[in-house]
Amino acid sequence: MKKISNMKPLLVSAMLFLSVTGKAQSHGNRLSVGVGALYERGFDVTLAVEHETKNHNAWEYFANGYVKWAKDESARHVTKESFWNNYRTWGLGVAYKPCVVRSRNKYGSLRIGASAGSDTHEVVGWANLGYEHNYVLRHGWQLYWQVKTDLCIKGEDLFRTGIVLGIKLPTGSR
């Protein structure tokens, strides 16, 4: 009987430890901004709201802007006019991001999504596929890099692929 009474504090501690679930870096909402360079001669900006679900899986709702620059034939280099007025698109979309790699203060996710928008003349659509790696900082801030590929439907480009760097800020709501 004495052995059981000595084990009670240990059993109660073990039960409390097992009943408390870990919530660190999980189930948060974030605002993110990313900028990147895409092949061929492209510049990309993405603003997004990310809602994290279980196990670092997440849904991302985003707005994207893209500019494809060209050389000005008369000046023989890129000018302000040839940068901003060559080809540009904007789009709105959603992406599912299942977590595929996790370790201390970092995790990686596939990014699978679709978006639609315009190239200022007609409706354009994209299938989005990529990989995103996140580094968790203090107070919920995150830095990330992303390798992305967009398959364009009815656009000037068929494929757009490149690297994006960005930051995610916690919204405070869980």
Q: What would you call each of these model-derived segments?
A:
Residues 2-11:
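Bacterial N-terminal signal peptides that target proteins for export
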Residues 14-23:
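Hydrophobic h-region of N-terminal signal peptides that target proteins for export
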Residues 22-71, 162, 168-174:
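Short glycine/proline- and aromatic-enriched beta-strand/turn motifs that initiate or cap beta-hairpins
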Residues 33-46, 86-88, 115-127, 151-160:
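Solvent-exposed loop/turn segments connecting transmembrane beta-strands
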Residues 50-143:
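Gram-negative (and chloroplast) outer-membrane scaffold detector with strong preference
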Residues 120, 130-174:
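Gram-negative outer-membrane beta-barrel domains
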